[in-house]
UniProtKB/Swiss-Prot annotation:
GO terms for biological process: chemical synaptic transmission; monoatomic ion transmembrane transport; regulation of membrane potential. The keyword rRNA-binding does not apply. It comes from Caenorhabditis briggsae. This is Acetylcholine receptor subunit alpha-type acr-16. It holds the Pfam family Neur_chan_memb.
């Protein structure tokens, strides 16, 4: 039994040694008189046809700011080398052999739009040569390609980037570069979390230069990338919309709360922060403004305008009759027309269309108020005159009373004279009593007048406060409509919303 095993092992070792000898002989025969600088064609006037295919593995990153795309891909080259053909039967049925890159001829095809520091970033793998002379070379690499990023619809944008491959020294009459069947292979593609890849295309071009009549072919492998919007929707757009809607709360706060302007300024700073994030993500170009930037700018304009109107509302709220007089146009617009349009109700006032004054009418009852003011001024002058007469008569009464007392104390004065004097004093006393009552009436009238004037001042202040409420309510409606309309209008213009 042991002798049989030894015999089988010896046969196996002989076959292996014989096979390795066949492969060595094949390498020696193929490399004999071979020059890797020679184009593998039987006739030098014929071009070498090279087929190229790109097997995309992964989109690593898209740097919008620097306009660079990082891609992991395999390049698949095939061509025929007539110097590397052999008969399988003569070499132990060997079907293929491997050569290191540079050992045999290979096309000088490069990625034209590479921005890598080494320019050619492929790994130089072995080349597989088949007995028919077909050479198959698959060098993998991490490619950094320049791509013009169109940020007009960011983050609802689609980018079209491409690989441009072409020979660096051979023209089209010496090297014919053709896309292989299934030129862009994405069967092993690992999906990217930020970019979807709905379409890939291949295109061959021939370019003629002024210096040379020969064509220079190149092959473009296009990547049609569509940005996924979920991240931007939840991390930028929704917070910005909610922050902008907070400006509407500022129009519902009463001015006496003290936090009205603080809220608006805080929201404005928040929008500025979001806008700075978008500017950092976008490339520094002046060709277009990104859609998201337009949205944030619109939000910032809304918040800025709301801050300005909040200041105006506070200014109206704290106005007094001593500092401001409400004009007829302002009165009719803010106290009648706009409240009626907005269906605002004010206690003690019933607004109907029939009771609305003309928008450009003068101040109501202005002439009657002037007439009343003149009458009151005359009455005040008359009261001053009556007060002067009352003072004279009162003084006369006091002097007469003093004289009467003096005469009574003097016994030499006749009684008839004293009687007549007492009668006169009685009349003067009655008149003095009436004058004192008139003085009291006059003082009460002054107090009443001051109370009426105070009520008028309070009513004027309330008018200013109500006007501030009207402006607040008007801004609430206008800004709500504008925010909704602008948001729908901006995002409705995007080529897509969900990818």
């Amino acid at each position: 039994m042991s002798s049989v095993c030894a015999l089988l092992l010896s046969c196996a070792l002989f076959l292996v040694a014989h096979g390795s000898l066949q492969e060595r002989r094949l390498y020696e025969d193929l490399m004999r008189n071979y020059n890797n600088l020679e184009r593998p064609v039987a006739n030098h006037s014929e071009p070498v046809t090279v087929h190229l295919k790109v097997a995309l593995q992964q989109i690593i990153d898209v740097d919008e700011k620097n306009q660079v795309v990082y891609v992991n891909a395999w390049l698949d080259y095939t061509w025929k080398d007539y110097n590397l053909v052999w008969d399988q039967a003569e070499y132990g049925n060997i079907t293929d052999v491997r050569f290191p890159a540079g050992k045999i001829w290979k096309p000088d095809v490069l990625l034209y739009n590479s921005v890598d520091t080494n320019f050619d970033s492929t790994y130089q793998t072995n080349m597989i040569v088949y007995s028919s002379g077909l050479v198959h070379w698959v060098p993998p690499g991490i490619f950094k390609i320049s791509c013009k990023i169109d940020i007009q619809w960011f983050p609802f944008d689609e980018q079209k980037c491409f690989f441009k491959f072409g020979s660096w020294t051979y023209d089209g009459y010496k090297l014919d570069l053709q896309p292989a069947t299934g030129g862009f292979d994405i069967s092993e593609y690992l999906p990217n979390g930020e970019w979807a890849l709905p379409l890939t295309t291949v295109e061959r071009n021939e370019k003629f230069y002024d210096c040379c009549p020969e064509p220079y072919p190149d092959v473009h492998f296009y990547l049609h990338m569509r940005r996924r919007t979920l991240y931007y929707g939840f991390n930028l757009i929704m917070p910005c919309i909610l922050t902008t809607l907070m400006t509407l709360l500022g129009f519902t706060l009463p001015p006496d709360a003290g936090e009205k302007i603080t809220l608006q300024i805080t929201v404005l700073l928040s929008i500025c922060f979001f806008l700075s994030i978008v500017s950092e993500m976008s490339p520094p170009t002046s060709e277009a403004v990104p859609l998201l930037g337009i949205f944030f700018t619109c939000c910032m304009i809304v918040v800025t305008a709301s801050t300005v109107f909040t200041v105006y509302v506070l200014n109206l709220h704290y106005r007094t009759p001593e500092t401001h007089d409400m004009g007829p146009w302002t009165r009719n617009l803010l106290l009648y027309w706009i409240p009626w349009i907005l269906r605002m109700k004010r206690p003690g006032h019933n607004l109907t269309y029939a009771s609305l004054p003309s928008l450009f009418a003068s101040k109501p009852n202005r002439h009657s108020e002037s007439l009343i003011r003149n009458i009151k001024d005359n009455e005040h002058s008359l009261s001053r005159a009556n007060s002067f007469d009352a003072d004279c008569r009162l003084n006369q009464y006091i002097m007469t009373q003093s004289v009467s007392n003096g005469l009574t104390s003097m016994g030499s004065i006749p009684s008839t004279m004293i009687s007549s004097t007492n009668g006169a004093l009685t009349d003067v006393s009655q008149q003095a009593t009436l004058l004192i009552l008139h003085r009291i009436y006059h003082e009460l009238k002054i107090v009443t007048k001051r109370m009426i004037e105070g009520d008028k001042e309070e009513q004027a202040s309330n008018n200013w406060k109500f006007a501030a409420m009207v402006v607040d309510r008007l801004c609430l409606y206008v800004f709500t409509i504008f925010i909704i309309a602008s948001t729908i209008g901006i995002f409705w213009s995007a080529p897509y919303l969900v990818a």
